[in-house]
């Protein structure tokens, strides 16, 4: 679409630099314009990729996961809501969050896609944030939510 302008080009450049330095990675995007910018850069740089978001049918998603796990795809661009449950993506060793999310459950569950049985390598999660924006506050709020979730689960374990 000729009306689209990517205003966070540096963000996408950083993400793709990180992707190019790793064998297999997952990149979480929250917005369609992020997905589109990442796809554009991956194609420009010749990086093999697939997308998992709400537009991808279940059978295609299954095929994408199998090809990724077989090493045929270098990176997956994923919307966390569409890829945070039921997928094992242990071929990846890195998760890169292109921008912050407020949703603690999606954040936690998406990060667990590479921390599963079958993961034999060291893993990392990278959070991209812009200085002098609301993004550091969002990540701080997200960490607070995660702490509360962990405390609640601990209390529930003690009660049961």
Model-found features: residue ranges?
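A short beta-strand element within the Helicase C-terminal
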Residues: 87-100, 124-127
């Amino acid at each position: 679409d000729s009306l689209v302008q990517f205003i966070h080009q540096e963000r996408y450049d950083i993400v793709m630099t990180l992707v190019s330095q790793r064998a297999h990675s997952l990149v979480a995007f929250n917005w369609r314009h992020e997905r589109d910018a990442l796809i554009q850069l991956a194609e420009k740089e010749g990086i093999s990729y697939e997308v998992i978001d709400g537009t991808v049918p279940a059978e295609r998603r299954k095929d994408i996961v199998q090809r990724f796990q077989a090493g045929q795809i270098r990176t997956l661009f994923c919307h966390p809501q569409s890829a945070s449950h039921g997928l094992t993506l242990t071929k990846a060793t890195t998760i890169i969050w292109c921008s912050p999310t407020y949703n603690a459950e999606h954040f936690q569950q998406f990060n667990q896609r590479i921390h599963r049985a079958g993961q034999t390598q060291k893993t990392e999660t990278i959070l991209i944030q812009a200085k002098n924006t609301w993004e550091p506050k969002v990540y701080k709020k997200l960490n607070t939510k995660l702490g509360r979730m962990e405390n609640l689960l601990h209390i529930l374990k003690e009660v049961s």
